[in-house]
Amino acid sequence: MNTKLTKIISGLFVATAAFQTASAGNITDIKVSSLPNKQKIVKVSFDKEIVNPTGFVTSSPARIALDFEQTGISMDQQVLEYADPLLSKISAAQNSSRARLVLNLNKPGQYNTEVRGNKVWIFINESDDTVSAPARPAVKAAPAAPAKQQAAAPFTESVVSVSAPFSPAKQQAAASAKQTNIDFRKDGKNAGIIELAALGFAGQPDISQQHDHIIVTLKNHTLPTALQRSLDVADFKTPVQKVTLKRLNNDTQLIITTTGNWELVNKSAAPGYFTFQVLPKKQNLESGGVNNAPKTFTGRKISLDFQDVEIRTILQILAKESGMNIVASDSVSGKMTLSLKDVPWDQALDLVMQARNLDMRQQGNIVNIAPRDELLAKDKAFLQAEKDIADLGALYSQNFQLKYKNVEEFRSILRLDNADTTGNRNTLVSGRGSVLIDPATNTLIVTDTRSVIEKFRKLIDELDVPAQQVMIEARIVEAADGFSRDLGVKFGATGRKKLKNETSAFGWGVNSGFGGGDKWEAQTKINLPVAAAANSISLVRAISSGALNLELSASESLSKTKTLANPRVLTQNRKEAKIESGYEIPFTVTTASGGGNSTNTELKKAVLGLTVTPNITPDGQIIMTVKINKDSPAQCASGNNTILCISTKSLNTQAMVENGGTLIVGGIYEENNGNTLTKVPLLGDIPVIGNLFKTRGKKTDRRELLIFITPRIIDTAGNSLRY
């Protein structure tokens, strides 16, 4: 009798345990696949939907332990081994309250988890010092239970949540590592979250958008080459497709590749820690009408199989499945046949409404469903009632003192003038309202209904902000290259009456002397020397009672000059900046007045001028309108006279460069080539000998002006300016 009772009680305990295990869910399969960048995915399958596990990481030995609450194990093989550089073995064990997976690694690693239906995806990659936690004492994991042993020792290790971004332990570890790292995860709103840790960077990052890329730049923060990495996160089904961390000169760039419609939320958790949340744009559930954009359904999956059932009954079932409060209008009627399997409940509701031309308006967890025309009529009546109330409501007055904008700028924005400042002249002010401006106090005075005043408040909050500033640095280089060569001759003769017993003499120098006799000088001496000869040779030869002198002179010069100017100017966005360097030349101007003439002196500029107007685009580019003029004094012929004039050269252009890029403006180039020849008529034309009766000159001058313009956007909330 006792034996039978014992067997019955044992059977009840076994059945109860089996029922509890079945109701909680069991691990049925484990599969491993590879991703780029040495990343692994462990896909754990369950026989029903489960929750995200908790776990912890140990570095010695390198393991990842995951605990699944109220979960059993239903696998034939509970120890899986792999010949992989990162993952070596997976062991599964369970006790009365939970199941544990222990992932043995060949090197320290880190992980992230994601629940997908009845599967848990575990993403594993090599550990980075920035996000590991060496400051925390290592936790030694309990060994996995053998394959035949279903009950394991109680789990006593501390459990760490895997979704907590930048815990104090992580920050402390990253501070000791002095490195830069990125991490990616997905939240419950289907948003991609990128966490950036940049130790040693104390400023704010520059964020810009280029098409489907978000570019985050950390200025003057150098990234080691070994830390450059790229994450392909397209499988997470978020707006983020790829995350790249790379080095660009002395800067660090984080490039987020996106798809579809999204919005960016930037958060700073601590100095050097930044979180970027890329959210899919919310769909307006309260708007009616046809929307051709693809819809996203996130409700719990259900199965429906009805034939010729009242629509109101289907709505009642959907209300129970979704937990929403659905209120159906009296106009909702009819029957329909419906057969759906594993479809989100919100998609099933959308199909029912489309089939019967219904629409909905949602407020909190209450959904009002009615025919589309009926809801549109209610919306129209509501808006008309609001308009009637606004036309009859009280008027209020509000003063807005502007901080950064000039109140006169709002005159053109609101289309105001002194003759009419009522709502007939602009779109914001109602028919009974008015707007006044006070330039003395830079104040805008608005008199209108509360709703209009609130619109003004929002408009002023958006427009009355500090203008972005641009530091424009110009490098002006003027290079000159000159060459000149001159060759001349001086030819003549002197003589005296020859004395008895004298012989001819030879000597150097034009003034070589001869003694005795009466001197004579040739009247046809050739004098074609170089103006400023570098060298000359004089020859004197006695001929009978005279002498022939010949002086050859030559000059050659080579010049190279370079002038460099480096002016800088700070200007606001879309405001003109001007840099000038040069002279003011006085000119005498004669004017007729009364019966005589009066003379006045006027100053004219002869300058090298640079005028730049920057325009910052929404994606961080800079469009620059550039005007360059180079004026210099010159001599101009006026009849038989030479007067002072100004030579002018100018250049106008518009170009777009990135922030910190350089625009090169050239094309102002001059080259002067000249050859001169002075000779004695007839004698200078004689071949060979004619060179003694000529002076030749050759001159070449080249000048080129190059201007390098580098704009940089200044962070108005950042550090002080540096020149």
UniProtKB/Swiss-Prot annotation:
> Which InterPro entries does this chain map to?
AMIN_dom, GspD/PilQ, NolW-like, NolW-like_sf, Pilus_4_PilQ, Secretin/TonB_short_N, T2SS/T3SS_dom, T2SS_GspD_CS
Q: What Pfam families does UniProt report for this protein, alphabetically? A: AMIN (PF11741), Secretin (PF00263), Secretin_N (PF03958), STN (PF07660)
NCBIfam families per record: IV_pilus_PilQ
Please describe the quaternary structure of this protein. Answer: Homododecamer. Tetramer of trimer.
Q: Which UniProt keywords apply?
A: Cell outer membrane, Competence, Membrane, Protein transport, Signal, Transport
Role according to the record? Required for type IV pilus biogenesis and competence. Could function as a pore for exit of the pilus but also as a channel for entry of heme and antimicrobial agents and uptake of transforming DNA.
Keyword Phosphoprotein in the entry? The reply is no
* Entry superkingdom: Bacteria
Q: What is this protein called?
A: Type IV pilus biogenesis and competence protein PilQ
One GO term describing the cellular component = cell outer membrane
